């Protein structure tokens, strides 16, 4: 029997504490949401099944549309055997200018054997004056597969805003069976020389990372080297500032530039190729991206 729980509480505190737990399993030839629990202003807006294979597309929404000083936002998501979930957001996330308090986001993803999770939130904007702390922990079992990304935009580009005050701290860890495969840590403060240095952001406003872990049968160097060369050819044709590397059997792409739409298009194209190579699936972009 499916277990779906929902809770909602409000608080008079001048900050938000919000948490969303989601669980996905495979039942009756499609992926379903078997567990849902939320606290505060974060929830699933919609679930769709646009693919013939029964992949579940879920849209998660945080009604305040951003994280302010003192806020804590937590996501806990799990996929079970044979489930395939695609998770995205309806629009850009935001780290707002702070009131002097730190803001936090925690993301915990648990991908069990034979399941697939695609974690594809839209970009996050870092407002000048934000104090942002973000942590992402991804745990894969041996035969689990994962595709995900993180896109950060410094300042509000429409206002030509730069990040001159505040700080940003991001920690990303990807594990498989308690073995650490990837560990990324980034910290900078507003106005840091690193933001303008050619060894850092080089005066660019958009920085993004893409990670992908294939099914077990495609983890040999024979397959991975073929696939990464095909993706390099794609990136060259698109003429976008993306670099590709392999960290053991994790494919990693990095974007550094000024146009977040070009970043999104590049990562979406890489994701589409990997879906075809690894899962024999069409690209099937989330419909919310077209609105």
Swiss-Prot record:
Membrane-crossing segments per the record: none
Tagged with keyword Lyase: no
Quaternary data: UreD, UreF and UreG form a complex that acts as a GTP-hydrolysis-dependent molecular chaperone, activating the urease apoprotein by helping to assemble the nickel containing metallocenter of UreC. The UreE protein probably delivers the nickel.
Protein species of origin: Acinetobacter baumannii (strain ATCC 17978 / DSM 105126 / CIP 53.77 / LMG 1025 / NCDC KC755 / 5377)
Residues in the signal sequence: none
Purpose of the protein: Required for maturation of urease via the functional incorporation of the urease nickel metallocenter.
Pfam families: UreD (PF01774)
Lineage, opening ranks: Bacteria, Pseudomonadati, Pseudomonadota, Gammaproteobacteria, Moraxellales
Family designation: Belongs to the UreD family.
UniProt keyword terms in alphabetical order: Chaperone, Cytoplasm, Nickel insertion
Protein name: Urease accessory protein UreD
PANTHER family: UREASE ACCESSORY PROTEIN D
Subcellular location: Cytoplasm
GO MF annotations in UniProt: nickel cation binding
GO cellular component: cytoplasm
Superkingdom: Bacteria
Gene that specifies this protein: ureD
């Amino acid at each position: 029997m499916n277990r779906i729980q929902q809770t909602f509480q409000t608080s008079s505190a001048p900050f938000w504490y919000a948490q969303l737990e989601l669980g996905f399993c495979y039942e009756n030839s499609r992926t379903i949401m078997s567990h849902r629990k939320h606290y505060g202003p974060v929830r699933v807006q919609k679930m769709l099944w646009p693919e013939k294979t029964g992949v579940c597309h879920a849209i998660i929404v945080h009604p305040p549309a951003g994280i302010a000083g003192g806020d804590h936002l937590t996501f806990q998501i799990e996929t079970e055997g044979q489930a395939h979930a695609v998770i995205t957001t309806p629009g850009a996330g935001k780290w707002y200018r702070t009131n002097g308090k730190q803001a936090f986001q925690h993301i915990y993803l648990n991908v069990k054997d034979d399941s697939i999770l695609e974690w594809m939130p839209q970009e996050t904007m870092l407002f000048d004056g934000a104090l942002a702390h973000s942590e992402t922990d991804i745990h894969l079992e041996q035969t689990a597969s994962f595709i995900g990304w993180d896109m950060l935009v410094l300042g509000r580009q429409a206002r030509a805003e730069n990040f001159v005050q505040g700080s940003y701290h991001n920690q990303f860890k990807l594990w498989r069976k308690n073995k650490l495969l990837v560990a990324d840590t980034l910290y900078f403060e507003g106005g840091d020389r690193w933001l303008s240095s050619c060894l850092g952001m080089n005066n660019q406003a958009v920085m993004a990372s893409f990670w992908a872990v294939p099914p077990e049968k495609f983890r040999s160097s024979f397959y991975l080297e073929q696939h990464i060369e095909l993706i390099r050819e794609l990136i060259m044709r698109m003429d976008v500032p993306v670099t590709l590397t392999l960290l053991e059997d994790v494919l990693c792409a990095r974007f550094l530039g000024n146009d977040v739409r070009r970043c999104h298009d590049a990562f979406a194209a890489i994701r589409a190729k990997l879906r075809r190579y690894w899962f024999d699936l069409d690209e099937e972009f989330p419909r919310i991206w077209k609105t």
